[in-house]
Amino acid sequence: MEGASERLEGMRQGNLRHRNMARVFGLIGSAGAAVSRADLAAASGLTKPTVSKLVDSLVQAGLVVEGEAVAGVMGRPKIPLQLEGYACFGVGLEIMWKRIRAVAMGLDGRVLARNEFALDVPSADYREVVRESAALVRGLRDSARRVCAAGGVDAPRDLGLCLAIPGRTDSDEETILSAPILDWFDVPFIRDLRDELGDEETFSAFNDNQLAVLFEVHEHPGESFLFVSASTGIGGAVVLDGHVYGGLNGWAGEIGHTVVDRHGPLCRCGRQGCIEAYLSRKALQERAGVASTTHIAETIGALFQDPDAQETAGELGELLGIALSNALNVLDINKVVLAGYLVDLLPHIAGPLAETLRGRALVNEVGEVALEASEAPGEASVLGACRMTLRPVFDNPAQWL
């Protein structure tokens, strides 16, 4: 009869195998190109026989595929390995002010399908928003399955749905506590959408800015940077060594409510002079003298065709530079990643922004501030939501064997 010590040892060995498998699977996923078993052994520090056994299990499960053997200069030919992108997929759904967007992503990060439709969410009938969102998700799942079937996988695993919300959600993951831009307060949208879809275990919801950060972390592995995004307001996050630092309440990096002028305009948060009071969608529309329904790209275009365009660029560039410099000085990091419509705004304010950063950011004493634009400025949140659905497979691929 097996004793307690034998059972404990078996559990330890099983846990070790699971950790090693996750390590190897993650290396295949992050390689950017096909890798061999020998490459994985060298990168992971595991023995070649151990790596081979782990890879064989992943191949048998359909999570990893082998390519044609490639002859090397020395030794046996190498068999390239890569993730089977059609093995499973997840869906990200983003609820925005005037639009609802959904994207389906395969295991290897490729977008399998995307769709969106225009809807004035704040003024729309609430039940209509629920029904239309559910219909969008169902249609996208069908499209993703067809793409996977065309790629040779007839029964891909559906990893579920992640919802991106421009606001705060309750810990019960059923209620949106506050999404001012949608005019939603204490709205049980998460619960109602889950019920409409019939999804239970495969449904999650997060703040849109948090999900956008997740996308950027994947694009900048292991790096430290300040993430700043604009969709309706100004949001941000702190990433240290590839990990999002949330702070005590999960609000770390909320640069939008950094005060840049204590005598400045009133912000929607009730405080004066926040950077959001200058750079929010509403603030830019009012400054450009356009209607509240005007698309942000048109708003920015109108703003800088104005006779006062140079003055506007100088003021907005300087104020954003002050906010960024303050944050960089506190965090002692040198990189900023901009997303959302800040990417569209950047060419117009780049000069005064750079000048302010040079004069105020302490990092310039030993280097310079690296200012980057997101590669997916308008879709970072929904793509991050897709990434969130894939996480369970990468965290523990052994569960999917």
Where are these regions (language model features)?
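ATP-binding/phosphotransfer module of carbohydrate and carboxylate kinases, centering on a glycine-rich
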Residues: 1-69, 73-77, 82-157, 219, ...
